[in-house]
């Protein structure tokens, strides 16, 4: 290795030496060249003039080029500057217009900002006002709600008070009805005492003229009073509805509308019946005139034409009995509906039958007295024809007297009749005593009267089953009371006995079916019979009716509850003494169950009673239509017609 390295070192050293020699040679060459160049320069110095001229030419050429370039640059600059100045002027105008627009926009912005501030202020004020209004509204609403609650409480209390008053009013009506019945009984008793006293005093002090003339007038009126007492027709309707609802005021208005509609229907039906009965009344009036003429010719034989007509009237009686059976069938159906109500009045039925039995005996005695008196006075009437004519003129004027249109006004004819009644007490009592004596002397004639009563009573019932036929017939009787008196006294005197017999038959057939609804009418009749005792009440009532005329006839139509059916009925009631009208108008009872007052019961009772003579039948229908949301109604309708 060392050898090799030595060899390398040796070779390298040789190479370095070679390179050094080459380098030195090159340097020498270069130095030689430099030296040679200096020599050339020096040679060139002789040509310096030529170079300067060349340089001058070049310099002149370059200056020409530079001048040209300078001139071109200036021209270009000027053109460019002119263009820029023109553009600047145009931009200035645009800038000016832009500045003006900017100023305008600034002014608008300022005005809008001011307006916005005002609107914002107004908005705030409105919001404050709205908040105030809402607060006030809430306050008012709360106050109104409190007021409504208070008014509802007051209304509820008022309704309770109204219900209490209605109950009290119903109780007072019941008491009033009982008092009216009792007053009527006492009135009959007083009238009987007055007539008996007048008859007694007339027989002592008065001459023949004083007691003969009243006897004729009595005979003209007996037919009305005799028929009136034993003949009662009752139609009783009771409607009880329990209605559960929340709107009581709507129901009241509906009930009032229904009642007004019913009243209108009744008025229309009454007018139609009145027209029909006027035509029939004219025919009956003509027949009555014929009978009067026959009575003048043969007053003693007044009963003979009745005996001849007996056979034809018996057939009519059979038909009437069939009609009564049909009515009893209807009564039985109605009695089943109101059975619970009818059981309570069974005692009154038995008492009434006893009263009717007593009434029959009294009527027989009265009829015997009247028949005997009629025969005794028949000859005297012919002699006293002139005073009788005066009585005729006086009585039609009474019949034409204005009829009161309300039950309050009916008291006036009663007072007038009582005044006239006091003047002739003595004469009437004298006539009654003579009748009693005549009844004892003629028992045979009483038997004949009983036979004639049956056929005579049947056509009367047919004529009077429409209420208005009897009005026309009675109007004719009132117009000519003195003429009809002689013959009618015998005929009408026979009617009460037959009618009371029929009442007993009807009472036995009706049985327990008629007990409840006929309670009021039986009490009235029983009191009349019990008070008058020996049947004098009916006999004493006849002369009183004679003196009072049509004014007294209207008094017979007793309107218990202060309500009449219609003006048409009132006018006809003034012309006839055979009708008694008892009408109880609607009575509403409002009760509230529970403290909240949500459930309310209204009890409406409508009671209509028609008390008529001559077996009259007057049917009054009540139609009540209810249209209410959520209505529960229970209705009990009881309609009973009794043939007394």
From Swiss-Prot:
Region named Linker 2: 73-76
Annotated ranges, domain IF rod: 1-197
UniProt-annotated stretches for the region Coil 1B: 1-33
Chief place of localization: cytoplasm
Gene Ontology annotations for the cellular component aspect, listed alphabetically: axon; neurofilament
UniProt biased composition (Acidic residues): 274-292, 308-328, 351-368
Keywords: Cell projection, Coiled coil, Cytoplasm, Cytoskeleton, Glycoprotein, Intermediate filament, Phosphoprotein
Cell compartment(s), UniProt: Cytoplasm, Cytoskeleton; Cell projection, Axon
Sample GO molecular function, one term: structural constituent of postsynaptic intermediate filament cytoskeleton
Glycan-carrying positions: 217
Region (Linker 12): 34-50
Residues with the Phosphoserine modification: 11, 131, 203, 215, 253, 269, 298, 332, 340, 345-346, 401, 406, 442, 465, 512, 550, 566
Residues modified as Phosphothreonine: 357
Entry-linked Pfam families: Filament
Residue spans of biased composition, Basic and acidic residues class: 329-350, 369-400, 422-470, 485-508, 545-557, 568-582
Region Coil 2A: start-end pairs: 51-72
Post-translational modification: There are a number of repeats of the tripeptide K-S-P, NFM is phosphorylated on a number of the serines in this motif. It is thought that phosphorylation of NFM results in the formation of interfilament cross bridges that are important in the maintenance of axonal caliber. Phosphorylation seems to play a major role in the functioning of the larger neurofilament polypeptides (NF-M and NF-H), the levels of phosphorylation being altered developmentally and coincidentally with a change in the neurofilament function.
Biased composition (Low complexity): 474-483
The keyword Glycoprotein belongs to this UniProt entry's keyword annotation: yes
Gene3D superfamilies linked: 1.20.5.170, Single helix bin, Vasodilator-stimulated phosphoprotein
Subunit record text: Forms heterodimers with NEFL; which can further hetero-oligomerize (in vitro). Forms heterodimers with INA (in vitro).
Family named by the database record: Belongs to the intermediate filament family.
Protein name: Neurofilament medium polypeptide
